[in-house]
Each structure stands twice: as structure tokens, then as C-alpha cells.
Amino acid sequence: MAFVIRLGLCWFALLALAGCQTNDFNAESYAELDQRYDVVIRRDVRGVPHVLGATDPDTAFGFAYAQAEDNWQLIEDAMPFYRGNSAVYSGMDGAVTDYLVKWLGLWETVHENYKWDLSPDTRAYVEAYADGLNFYAATHPDKVDESKLPVTAKDVVVGHMLRHLLFYGFDGVVREVNKAERQRDISTPSEAMAVPADAKEITLGGLPIGSNAFAIAPHFSEEGATRLAINSHQPTTGPVAWYEAHIQSKTGLNVMGGLFPGSPSISVGFTENIAWGATVNRPDLVDVYVLEVNPDNEYQYRLDGEWRDLERDEVDIKLTLWGFLPWTVSREVLASEHGPVLRTEHGTYAIRYAGMGELRQVEQWYRMNRATNFSEWREAMAMKSFASFNFAYADKEGNIMFLHNSLTPRRDPRYGWSQYLPGDDSSLIWKETLGFSQLPQVVNPASGYVHSANQTPFNVTAEADNPKLENYKPGHGFQMDMTNRAQ
């Protein structure tokens, strides 16, 4: 793909790159943000923060401040990644992810829909969380890089959007398409498949890794209590290492558990009444379409017998070369009716993926944190803003549940969706996903247990209580492999 490199306007100040960075961070005004919030942070003997606010936004403000005290560098370093300007700080190493953020149009989605897709109480909560980070930065100037400030609520929202994509392996599909040769055949209706062909174990250094969560019903436990074990396997340091906290407000929020630094809500944990754990799953949630390009116009593709125009735009990737030289790389971004488009030496491809245009992840986590019973927790999960993850649930009323959470597309069962798809048929551009009640799940099984260890959702409890694969048409792309921990 052709691109243009332009020397930055600050080329004459090669030794003063900071002069090229502009920001709207007024430390003096941000240092007064604490006057708006009523919150107390206490730490237990292990240093775990217990945050008590008068309202949920008060709690969010204090929660952010506590996280910043413990993990400021991780939070700050993530901001350029979410904004698509990490190459300014890391050079060419960050250019690829910067292009990914811009190619996906994440910020356009947030700018257009932030006010409409997120409820007022969620916006107030996330904005208070951003205030807490900025208050910490303003009162600790020796620890922060002001060129990355201020943090906004939209930064937090985009961060969730991007991380959810990476958790189910979207980036792996993009890397595959960009390889030197085409990796898969184009599917035809005769290649319909009952199960996906390429489910893969999650590995590190060749060894299987992953997480575990299991719930035990009262009638299956010796003491007659509901039990939930959360055994999520994450690194001990870094941006996806668990951070433990307890957050509480006087308006109903009261939850403790683990999260990744920079998250405004608890990801796995418990309240006074309910608890849940999560494990990574790998359903097939990304489809690749091979486009037929007009030989007389490279910006047109065939769809339903007609030539359609590709959407075209140009984005600037700002870099710093050799640690001091600012450059700007201009790159073309294309999109078809299917989704974002990539040109390669072996073809032009459109990518369609679960979660396109979805920004409500922060709201769903918040609703889960506020849930007080099984019904409210399921209502939160029925938002279906998460593209993936398995969940194991338990509560003090004795309910247990396994949920294979995924934005599973409703695909044409005549095609093998683990292959590439012909891009000239609009009927293959799926627009709907399975409803919440249609996802593989187990509620209060007679067996008395459910477990999740990154395995297929069709083997999570006793055989008689498992979801049945035969209830689903081919093409949904459910994960079919077992893991060594699930057997």
C-alpha cells in the first residue's frame, strides 16, 4: 500500500520533541477536582484499597485515585495505545497498533455514540473515574508525563473496546490476512461444516495455559453452601495482571474482586449476594471476505452483481524516529459494506467481526457490579456488549450458572465459515447474533456443578446437563476443543 512520509512541523527542534507535544492538561484546575467528590480510601494490611463513596461517581473517583497510586505507569502507558498515537512515544513499534485503532474507526464510533449508547449514570461514573486519574496526575507532577494528559472518559471506553477485541483473537486474523500468501480457500455452499475446523489451545511457550472457574450448588457441597472458585491465570505484573480492590457507595454499589489497572469496575469478584468468574473463550467471531475489485477502478468492488464504491479516508500516523525526530506517515483506510478493508499482494479483503460499533462494555461491567441478585446479573449479561468470555456464576440463594458469552453471528449454514468467504454476495454479510437465551448455558443443573477451563461450552458439567450441539445449526463457530484442565 502506498504511503507518504511528511516531516513534522517541529523538524527544526529535533532536540526538543516535547515542544511538539500539546495537551490541555491544566494541573492547577485538575488539582481541585477532589472538592467535587465525597470519598474515603482505606487500605487493609495487605494494601488492598477499600473505597467508600457517598455516590457511585464519588466511589469511581476514589477508585481511580487508588489505582493510580499503585499502577500509574501502567495506566499512563496505555493511553497512547488506546488513542492511536503510541508511535509518538515508541517509534515504529507502535505504528502498527496505531493504524489498527484508526483503521477500525474506534474513535469515530465513540465520538458519534458516546452520549446515546451509554446511560447518563454510566457516563457520570466513567467521567468521575477519569477525574480521579487526572486529580492524581495533577497532585503528583513528578510522576506523570503531561503530554499524555488529561485522561478522558472516552479513553476509558475505547480502552475497553480495544481490549475486548484482542481477548478473542481479532489481531491474529489480521496478521493472518497480511501474510505473504493467502492462508485459506474461499468457501462455497458445498463446504458446510457441522463444527469449526481450527479451534486452538491457548498456549505460552508451547504449553497450554488458561483460566479456571467452577461453581458448586448447595446440594453438591458438604456444608450445604454455594461455592464459586475463581482461578484466572494472568501474569503477576503488567497491564493484564490482576489488581484487587473493594468499592462501595451509599447508593447500592458494594463489590470486591479483581480487575486490570485502568478499569473502572470489578471484572471478577463478589458482592454480598452474588459472585462470578470469567475465563477466555475462543469462538470464531471474525470473518474474512475476498473482494472482487473492478479492474478499471481499484476503489470499487462487486456486490450483488454491481460495482460499489469503497469508503475511503486517509489517516496520519505520527511517529518519533530515533527518539527525537517527529515524522508523519499518511495511510489510506478503506471500508466496504462488510467492514474495514485490507489490500495485500494476494488480494483485497474485508473483515467483519463481532462487536463492530459496540462501545457499551463499560456499562455492562458497571451493571454487573451493581447487580444484587441472579435476575439483575442476567439482565446485565443480556446487554451482550462483550464479544466473548465464559462466565461461571453463583449466589447465596443457591443458583449456579455457566454462560458461554459471545456475540455469535447468525451465519448461512451452507458455508464453511472457518474459510474465507466470497465478498460479492450481500446475503453472507451477517447482521444478527444469537439472542442471550440462545447462547450455550447451564442453569442449576441436577449434577450440582459447572466448570469452565477455556474449553468447549458443550462439556461444562455432567453429560445429561450439558448444552447440546445438535440444537445449533452449522456455522456458529463455537469452540469445540477441550483443554487438559477441563477433562
Give names to the regions the model predicted.
Residues A18-G19:
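C-terminal motif of bacterial Sec signal peptides marking the signal peptidase cleavage site
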Residues F386-A486:
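Hydrophobic alpha-helical segments
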